[in-house]
Swiss-Prot record:
GO CC terms, sorted: cytoplasm; ribonucleoprotein complex; ribosome
Subunit annotation: Part of the 50S ribosomal subunit. Contacts protein L20.
GO molecular function: rRNA binding; structural constituent of ribosome
Disulfide bonds: none
Protein's organism: Nitrosospira multiformis (strain ATCC 25196 / NCIMB 11849 / C 71)
Similarity field: Belongs to the bacterial ribosomal protein bL21 family.
Recorded coiled-coil stretches: none
Entry keyword Membrane: no
Annotated protein name in UniProt: Large ribosomal subunit protein bL21
Keyword Ribonucleoprotein annotated: yes
SUPFAM superfamilies recorded: L21p-like (SSF141091)
One Gene Ontology term from the biological process aspect of the record: translation
Length: 103
């Protein structure tokens, strides 16, 4: 059984026991997170497709960690003009583990 959820402006295919990093959600480590924006649920040949969301479906997850991704370097340069600009960015994330999918 798997589901497609939407969180943080992105879509993820999840199933029980899966660990994934999503955009930061302000919750405590070890607490339960309920995601109710479920776009699709599939159980074998039985597929429930939402328009846009599957009504009554939800995904439960446990928060494992709050952290920051590796630094992404942004570098701009104009050739022959001695213009160079460097910037870095680290995005916050929440690591979760899927504990249950309910329809």
């Amino acid at each position: 059984m798997y589901a497609v959820i939407k969180t943080g402006g992105k879509q993820y295919r999840v199933e029980n026991g899966l660990k994934l990093k999503i955009e930061q959600v302000p919750v405590e480590i070890g607490s339960e997170l309920l995601i109710d924006q479920v776009l699709m649920v599939a159980d074998g040949d039985n597929i429930s497709l939402g328009k846009p969301l599957v009504s009554g479906a939800s995904v439960k997850a446990t928060v494992l960690e709050q952290g920051r991704h590796d630094k992404v370097r942004i570098f701009k340069m104009r050739r022959r003009k001695h213009y160079r600009k460097q910037q870095g960015h680290r995005q916050n994330y929440t690591e979760i583990q899927i504990t249950g999918i309910s329809v």
